[in-house]
Every structure is written in structure tokens, then in C-alpha cells.
Amino acid sequence: MSQTTVRAESGEPSRRAVLAGGAAVLAAGTLAAKAQESGRPGRAIKNGRIRQSIVAWCFENHWDMDQIARVAVELGCESVELVAPKHFPTLKTHGLSCAIGTVDMSPDPPFAKGFNNPKYREQVLKATTEAIDACSEAGYKNVICFTGMREGIPDDVGATNCVEGFKRIVGHAEKKGVVLCLEMLNSRVTDHPMKGHPGYQGDHTEYCVDIIKRVGSPNLKLLFDIYHVQIMDGDVIRRIKQHRDVIGHVHTAGNPGRGELDAKQELSYPAIMEALLEIGYRGVVGQEFIPTRDPKQGLREAVTLCDV
């Protein structure tokens, strides 16, 4: 029997039923209001308590960099992120920043090689140094970094190697005023190369946090990717509060599927954004979903939803 049909002996609805029904109506009303707001033209960001950014790679199949920048401005976002330094002038033309810079490990993706593997250490050091220098020169404050793939390396050895590698580069980051943000990625999803990363060593939140704390620098922090954390560890809001001191950047996407932040996915993004505000997070939230329909409408919905 549904809770909403349970009645007390008097024949009246039970208190639990009334409260449950009221909560459901309130939640539905809030989501409906957000959905209505997202359909309106103009700026999607009204409150501005959550600073927002568009992650470029997700939309490069739909728009060039100038178009991505124009969409960011239209929605009220302050940044387009994970872009190569050659695109920094385009961002500046539109009055945008790059909330977090990328590392060029081409021809491989940047997460494929990291400090966990000594044979890549010099390559990672060089690429990370170049990224730090480029972002510092442009006035941008964050650079992404990764553990790398396991390739047979035990987790404890990989962590120790990461600590040693980050200790070699973090002093340069401190000197340049740049924060390295270590991203945790999920290793479970196997049906798409950018929805999951089987073999990635830093595939749990606490594993990455341990590395960060062992390095012991304020210029190495955690990139808290809500989508990846949900898949591997869950308990997203509790982990945000638990690791409040080391969160340097945040990414979004709907789960399952890494799609839009809509009713087809399981994460409550307004509640998660409120948790970020509660811990005093002052960084940027990057919208990093892979669009399955009109990309601008999906972005408008996501930005509106996170504008708590």
C-alpha cells in the first residue's frame, strides 16, 4: 500500500502521509520552477552564488572555441575550461577566464600518463611545468593533473610514486601562484572512452586525498568530479564536507551516462550545490556533461539547476 493512502483509525490521512505528500509537492514545484527558468532566453545565472564554467571538450563537436565562449557569456558563465593556451586570447576577447588549464600529453589523453609511473615522470614534469607557466602568464590559477593508468603498478607503489612526482613540481606551482588539481576518475564504466577510464589508478576519492595530504602543499588540491565520485564512492555530499579543505575544483555530469543534469539521472544537483556553499567553497563548478540533445538547451538547464 502506498504511504499516501495510509489512514489513521479515524479515517483521516496519517501525519506521515501528509508530510510525505507535502514534501513531494514541494520538491516537484522546485524542479518545475527550475525547468521553467531554464527555458527562458538570456542569462541562466541569476543568483551567482555558484561560479560556473563550461568544459570545452564536451562541446567541441558542436561549436568552435569562439562559439563556446559566446554561449558561456550568454548563459552568464565566467569561464571556459580545459582549453589549450592557444585559445586563451579567444577567452580574453569575450571577457572570460579559464578556471582550470589542461596538460598536453599528446598524442595520448592527459589522464593516460601520470606520476604513478616513473617511466613517464620526466614527460609529465615537462608538460605540467609548461601548463603552469602558460596559466600563470595568462592570470589563470588552476591546472589539472592525474595519477595515470595502473599498467600493473600496485596501488601503494603508485601512490608513493605520485607523492614523489608531485613534490618535484609543486614548488614551481607555488612560485607561479598556480594550484594543481588532482582528478579522481571512475574505472567502472567501459562503454565509452570518456564516460569511464578502466585502469586509472586514482579511481577513489580517498586514494587521491591521501596523495594530496602526503605532499602537504596548499598548491595541490582535489578536483572533485561529482559524476566520477558517485560511480566509485557515492555519498557525494558527505564526501564534500569530509574533504572540504582539499577541494580545489568541481565538475558535474548526470549519472548514469554522463549526460545532461536532468530528470533521467540520479544526482540531486541543487542539494550538492548547497553543500558546496555550506563548506564555503569559492571555486568554480565546471559543466562537464556529454550532450545527448540540443547542447545549448542542456547547458542552460544545467547552469540554471546549479544556480542555487
For each feature predicted by the language model, list its residue ranges.
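Histidine-acidic metal/acid-base catalytic patches
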Residues: S2-V73, E81, G139-K141, H192-P193, ...
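Active-site mouth loops of central-metabolism enzymes
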Residues: S53-W63, F111-Q123
